[in-house]
């Protein structure tokens, strides 16, 4: 629950802007109830992931995703304190 899926122009400026925006909403330097309860220090990561969301719908036309010219689907891991693996599930419905 610390990962999120979205679309973004995968470019350093936009990535920096997103990082800054999420830090305004869920700053690193405030206490989180989750951290007090579990002691794992990633409360902010759970909040950021909840705001971005765990899923995404992308329309398909002619067998291709309908994305903007520079738009890409990305998985954001918002708790980078340790290495982990993630499984991405893609479901196509007619």
Language model region names:
Residues 1-94:
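Active-site histidine-anchored catalytic micro-motif
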């Amino acid at each position: 629950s610390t990962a999120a899926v979205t679309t973004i122009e995968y470019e350093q400026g936009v990535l920096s802007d997103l990082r800054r925006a999420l830090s305004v909403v869920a700053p690193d330097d405030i206490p989180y109830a989750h951290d007090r309860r579990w002691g794992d220090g990633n409360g902010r990561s759970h909040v950021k992931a909840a705001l971005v969301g765990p899923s995404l719908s992308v329309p398909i036309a002619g067998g291709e995703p309908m994305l903007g010219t520079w738009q890409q689907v990305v998985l954001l891991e918002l708790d980078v304190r340790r290495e982990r693996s993630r499984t991405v599930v893609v479901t196509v419905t007619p």
